[in-house]
Curated annotation (Swiss-Prot):
Protein's UniProt name: Cell surface superoxide dismutase [Cu-Zn] 4
The species this protein was found in: Candida albicans (strain SC5314 / ATCC MYA-2876)
Keywords of this entry: Antioxidant, Cell wall, Copper, Glycoprotein, GPI-anchor, Lipoprotein, Membrane, Metal-binding, Oxidoreductase, Secreted, Signal, Virulence, Zinc
Function: Superoxide dismutases serve to convert damaging superoxide radicals, a key form of ROS, to less damaging hydrogen peroxide that can be converted into water by catalase action. Degrades host-derived reactive oxygen species to escape innate immune surveillance. Involved in the occurrence of miconazole-tolerant persisters in biofilms. Persisters are cells that survive high doses of an antimicrobial agent.
Low complexity bias spans: 174-208
């Protein structure tokens, strides 16, 4: 029991808020292109464009979602869609700041949890546009999403379809011709509606304060690691 408690404390210390990202102004837009497959009718795009304030304007335009299995969460995943076109191989949610799947604030959620911050897809044909203050189009940023992927899930976290996030001029034959996977998301993220998190642009935290909290978490984790070593 003592060691379980220590592990829990360490996990809390390592968790941190994602900093506000305002470094995308003037950067190249990105897009995830979804195409129909033999097992999925989902098609359309999710576009990422630099906003005037340096955050990212996200435009979702998808059709063909299967009836009866919504609402549909969607997330940025940590790996691209491979040549095998298997959505399971995209790994877990993109989470460079050790966010949580159950957090109550946008900054504390996993960075890739777009639907957690802005709401699930709620219909078989769906369009929405919003500003996200945490992901980045800057290749030098820890929050950069280029080269990763997006997975659309059913309400039980089955991976329905996936697409690579590429620049507008990149080919994406491998990126979006993804196969159906009956396995649930490896990160076991629960479905969330729009009341679970507001738009990233409404968060009042600053980039500096986010970075400060991350640094403090690092110091705390190091101290706890020392305590663990002394107890073992």
């Amino acid at each position: 029991m003592k060691y379980l408690s220590i592990i829990s404390i360490v996990a809390l210390a390592l968790a941190g808020d994602s900093p506000i990202s305002t470094d995308s102004k003037g950067k190249a837009p990105l897009v995830a292109r979804f195409k129909k497959t033999s097992k999925s009718d989902i098609e359309g795009t999710i576009k990422f464009e630099p906003a005037n304030n340096g955050t990212v304007l996200v435009s979702v335009d998808l059709t063909g979602l299967p009836s009866g299995v919504g609402p549909y969460p969607y997330h940025v995943h940590e790996k691209p869609v491979p040549e095998s076109k298997n959505c399971t191989a995209t790994g877990m949610h993109f989470n460079p700041f050790n966010g949580s799947t159950t957090a109550k604030t946008p900054a504390a959620l996993e960075l890739g949890d777009l639907s957690g911050r802005h709401g699930n897809i709620t219909s078989e044909s769906f369009e929405v546009e919003y500003d996200d203050s945490y992901i980045s189009l800057n290749k030098d940023s820890k929050a950069y999403i280029g080269g990763l992927s997006i997975v659309v899930h059913s309400n039980n976290n089955t991976r329905l379809n996936c697409a690579n996030i590429t620049t507008l001029d990149e080919g994406d034959d491998t990126a979006s011709a993804a196969t159906w996977s009956n396995s649930s998301s490896s990160s076991s993220s629960s479905s969330k509606n729009s009341t679970n998190g507001s738009s990233g642009s409404s968060t009042s935290a600053s980039q500096g304060s986010g970075a400060g909290r991350a640094e403090i978490s690092g110091f705390l984790a190091a101290g706890i690691a020392g305590v663990v070593a002394a107890l073992i």
